[in-house]
Amino acid sequence: MKESERFLEKGIYKAFKALGEPTRLKIIKMLSNQGMCVCELSEVLDMLQPRISQHLKILKDAELVVENKEGYFVCYTLNKEGLERLWNDFTLFLEADVTSLPGYEKESSRMSNLSCNEKIKEIKGKLQKEC
């Protein structure tokens, strides 16, 4: 497997999709302060417990939170290792050569041809004349 293919495997897309929903981002913030159970998150966020559970499942599937049994309750905390791995993988993704990333072939080709793209030259020419 190419190094560039790891980005899809490691769940960068899944994690950012999970974080892209406002309620889930709020849950992440709440859990950054302390571990919490569904009933606590439900109270703090003023949402029904089943909805909170759905959000937590998505965050857990994206490896952003972990659950721990505490008696009758399940306590959720941030998955610090998962968040660190996400940050490291995202940094590698940003540093990777776009030509080596699967799914970026068309964009990579267009980027390499920008300097000779007539449409871009025309737009830049008009903007320079206006300034």
Task: Describe every region a protein language model picked out.
Residues 1-8, 33, 61, 81-131:
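C-terminal regulatory/oligomerization modules of transcriptional regulators
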Residues 6, 45, 63-67:
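Alpha-helical interaction segments
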Residues 10-51, 73-83:
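N-terminal helix-turn-helix DNA-binding core of bacterial DNA-binding proteins
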Residues 36, 51-52, 56-57, 69, ...:
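Compositionally biased, intrinsically disordered low-complexity segments enriched
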Residues 43, 54, 60-61:
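Alpha-helical residues within the helix-turn-helix
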Residues 60-70, 77:
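Beta-hairpin "wing" of winged helix-turn-helix
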